[in-house]
Amino acid sequence: MPKMKTKSAAKKRFKITGTGKIKAAAAGKRHGMIKRSNKFIRDARGTMVLADADAKIVKQFLPNGL
Protein backbone atom coordinates (compact mmCIF):
# COMPACT_ATOMS: atom_id res chain seq x y z
CA MET A 1 0.00 0.00 0.00
CA PRO A 2 1.31 3.49 -0.79
CA LYS A 3 2.05 6.00 1.92
CA MET A 4 -0.77 8.31 2.97
CA LYS A 5 -0.39 11.87 1.74
CA THR A 6 -0.26 14.76 4.19
CA LYS A 7 -2.95 17.43 3.74
CA SER A 8 -1.11 20.53 2.49
CA ALA A 9 -3.50 22.88 4.30
CA ALA A 10 -2.85 21.11 7.60
CA LYS A 11 0.94 21.17 7.35
CA LYS A 12 0.81 24.95 6.85
CA ARG A 13 -1.42 25.55 9.88
CA PHE A 14 -0.40 23.05 12.58
CA LYS A 15 2.78 21.94 14.32
CA ILE A 16 3.27 18.85 16.48
CA THR A 17 5.15 19.45 19.75
CA GLY A 18 7.72 17.08 21.18
CA THR A 19 5.10 15.59 23.50
CA GLY A 20 2.68 14.96 20.61
CA LYS A 21 0.30 17.85 21.21
CA ILE A 22 -0.87 20.06 18.33
CA LYS A 23 -0.13 23.79 18.25
CA ALA A 24 -2.11 26.25 16.13
CA ALA A 25 -2.73 29.98 15.86
CA ALA A 26 -5.72 31.31 17.78
CA ALA A 27 -8.89 31.86 15.75
CA GLY A 28 -10.78 35.12 15.25
CA LYS A 29 -7.88 37.51 14.56
CA ARG A 30 -8.33 38.27 10.84
CA HIS A 31 -10.64 41.27 11.04
CA GLY A 32 -13.24 42.98 13.25
CA MET A 33 -10.81 43.65 16.11
CA ILE A 34 -12.45 46.99 16.95
CA LYS A 35 -15.39 45.27 18.63
CA ARG A 36 -13.29 42.68 20.46
CA SER A 37 -12.21 43.20 24.04
CA ASN A 38 -8.57 43.88 24.82
CA LYS A 39 -8.47 40.61 26.77
CA PHE A 40 -9.60 38.67 23.68
CA ILE A 41 -6.97 40.33 21.50
CA ARG A 42 -4.25 39.64 24.08
CA ASP A 43 -5.27 36.01 24.59
CA ALA A 44 -5.48 35.35 20.83
CA ARG A 45 -1.87 36.45 20.31
CA GLY A 46 0.59 33.73 19.41
CA THR A 47 -0.28 30.03 19.41
CA MET A 48 -2.38 27.69 21.51
CA VAL A 49 -2.58 23.94 22.11
CA LEU A 50 -5.62 22.29 20.56
CA ALA A 51 -8.16 20.37 22.62
CA ASP A 52 -7.85 16.57 22.55
CA ALA A 53 -10.92 16.13 20.32
CA ASP A 54 -9.59 18.60 17.74
CA ALA A 55 -6.06 17.21 17.94
CA LYS A 56 -7.33 13.72 17.14
CA ILE A 57 -8.87 15.02 13.88
CA VAL A 58 -5.76 17.01 12.91
CA LYS A 59 -3.49 14.00 13.47
CA GLN A 60 -5.42 12.15 10.75
CA PHE A 61 -4.43 14.93 8.33
CA LEU A 62 -0.75 14.62 9.34
CA PRO A 63 -0.02 10.89 9.04
CA ASN A 64 3.74 11.42 8.71
CA GLY A 65 3.91 13.76 11.70
CA LEU A 66 5.14 17.01 10.17
Swiss-Prot record:
InterPro entries: Ribosomal_bL35 (IPR001706), Ribosomal_bL35-like (IPR021137), Ribosomal_bL35_CS (IPR018265), Ribosomal_bL35_sf (IPR037229). One of its GO terms (biological process) is translation. GO terms for cellular component: cytosolic large ribosomal subunit. Keywords: Ribonucleoprotein, Ribosomal protein. The keyword Ribosomal protein applies. GO terms for molecular function: structural constituent of ribosome. It comes from the Bacteria. HAMAP family: Ribosomal_bL35. Belongs to the bacterial ribosomal protein bL35 family. This is Large ribosomal subunit protein bL35. It comes from Brucella anthropi (strain ATCC 49188 / DSM 6882 / CCUG 24695 / JCM 21032 / LMG 3331 / NBRC 15819 / NCTC 12168 / Alc 37) (Ochrobactrum anthropi). The gene is rpmI.
